[in-house]
């Protein structure tokens, strides 16, 4: 992104026309970013709560007062309840690597605080990729133009992967066919050559059904499977139980369409699959993603330029996280708290202090009522680092104003392409805003942490991150990033097939989890007890199969009764804190 600045003020932003993936285009959110940057409600000074929790009433205080208050409270909390009673809570924020995964992690590790298991977005999918491919990487967007069949599975690329969409458009101009699989008729689905409505939560069944046809008709690449995969015989035995008729009953897709899709996918070269995170946020969603990711290994489509699979490219950014986060600073191993279970943690565990940054848990964490119940505790000391007042800051005892990405030096990784980027501040921070890095650096000094790493500058930490020794980062330095801004990782050379398994082989068979089948909750997951699919549970509660409506979602006339709404067909009230 390019920022035009006159007399110290940004006048407009635009996409970088020289970037090989974004090619000068900004999404609607970022294109309007200056409205956020200069919004009159931006937080500019540290504040202390003066009203009841949840009221959002504060008074302005100095940075010295704010930092001294926080340090004193964290020290006393650690002394009285143990440092594990202190919990950090953060996630993506403005996506800056330093401002989300460096000085903050060092601070909490040195403190001995509880660690946060950041599960809210993509844990199931990421785990699935590691089990299926051995790495969290995939076909790069530039190669989609070479595909002859593009299968978009559970993704609205037109609206949520706007920089990939032009490559798909170009591929179709060259003759590629676009097929979408989604419970919803998205804009992408409406533009596709073929759309298959699938019952929610049945993606695993469809993937196994496709494998049934591919293997049963001998359409798999036997040589590729023999040389590059493990567990084929077990997989072949497993998918025998998923003939098209059974899969059709589960998924709602006609058996004929399942057979035709399997044949077309297996025989069209190159063929590429683009999936997204929505389908892994369901019962057995991780297993569904694992199965889908195995399809290119069956057909050998990884051999082709423009073939393969992509959920995320994030695993290729092999920066030295250990050097940035410094878990070795922990005085002893500490407990891990699942961020998706924050409500339970605040109401059941001995959490006495909560430090929130790069996130708004009162609005985004599952079980919102339980989260708010915890945030209302008078004995809970809450600190929030924010750019604006949010649902979470309303409950905070201390609020600290932070910078935007236009005001930071930071390193930016990606999950949709293979270009690493560094940015310098385009603007000076307004008011008294400070970066996350600077805030935790100052807090470390207040806490008496005298390790040299707490005095590292942003440039020093970027150098540490790039010094992982991984081949993907060979030749990529701070100086080069400073000069070029964006640099492509040393993944497969341009024009050659992308190979995701250089660091590990394909694993295509199901392995029983070592943790006794305990589920990992990711995002807003509806948990059910017996492990069956969502579709079957909806059917059970309705007393029969769900009724399809035009956009491919489920409609159940009797479900309101099951969830406590007595009069079906009459308006029902939905209470929200805002009224």
Spans of features found by a protein language model:
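N-terminal leader/propeptide and maturation segments of large enzyme subunits in energy/redox metabolism
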Residues: 45, 49-60, 65, 217-255, ...
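Short, well-ordered loop/turn and helix-capping segments at boundaries between secondary-structure elements
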Residues: 113, 212, 216, 297-304, ...
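Extended redox/cofactor-interaction regions of prokaryotic respiratory oxidoreductases
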Residues: 101-169, 174-180, 204-208, 293-395, ...
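Flexible, glycine/charged-enriched surface loops at secondary-structure junctions
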Residues: 81-85, 220-225, 272, 303-310, ...
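Hydrophobic, low-acid, alpha-helix-prone terminal segments
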Residues: 525-528, 532, 538, 542-553, ...
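Short beta-alpha connecting loops at secondary-structure transitions
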Residues: 190-198, 403, 418-429
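N-terminal export/assembly segments and adjacent metallocofactor-ligating motifs
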Residues: 1-219, 241, 246, 254, ...
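Active-site phosphate/pyrophosphate-binding segments
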Residues: 210, 228-342, 483-485
